[in-house]
């Protein structure tokens, strides 16, 4: 394989995830920075009372990762509001990553918007650059955009019956 993606779920520092974080640390040590990449997915909450995004939770989770021997290369920041350049610079400075490596992952209307949002944020370019990959041709997303257009602008309405234990939850 040219690239292997591995997701570690959970919260940094939880006892359940420690063996997996240690595996990432060891793998990073064996492969080196030029052949491995750590993307840290983090929440940047918006406090309505203060009308501001809070970066402290991200700073603390990165600090915890660092204490376990893992330095993220990219911060993928889940957020309800756009990350301004000042917020990006602040997170870059306090989390020891490049400003271009602070990627906004703003809440999307549908999960199918996410690839286009990440392309807009240039995540692909950052990954290609950090891994020193040669093939940098532009992706052809015409089919994806057509699919997304049909999804967002349906021609017909279909009623679907759903049977299940937890289907009343909003995210079901």
Where does each model-flagged region fall?
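Short, high-confidence coil segments that cap the C-terminus of an alpha-helix
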Residues: 1-2
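Generic enzyme active-site microenvironment
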Residues: 5
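N-terminal beta1-alpha1 cap of cysteine-dependent amidohydrolase-like domains
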Residues: 8-172
């Amino acid at each position: 394989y040219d690239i292997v993606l591995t997701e570690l779920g959970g919260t940094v520092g939880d006892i359940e995830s420690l063996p997996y974080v240690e595996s990432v640390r060891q793998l990073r040590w064996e492969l080196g920075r030029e052949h491995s990449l750590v993307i840290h997915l983090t929440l940047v909450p918006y406090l309505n009372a203060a009308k501001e995004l809070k970066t402290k939770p991200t700073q603390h989770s990165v600090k915890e990762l660092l204490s376990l021997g893992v330095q993220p290369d990219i911060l993928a920041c889940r957020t309800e509001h756009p990350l301004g350049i000042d917020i990006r610079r602040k997170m870059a400075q306090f989390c020891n990553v490049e400003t271009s490596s602070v990627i906004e992952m703003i809440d999307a209307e549908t999960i199918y918007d996410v690839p286009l949002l990440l392309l807009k944020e240039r995540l692909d370019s950052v990954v290609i650059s950090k891994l020193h990959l040669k093939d940098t041709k532009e992706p052809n997303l015409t089919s994806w955009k057509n699919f997304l257009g049909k999804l967002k602008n349906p021609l017909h309405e279909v009623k679907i019956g759903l049977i299940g234990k937890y289907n009343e939850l909003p995210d079901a």
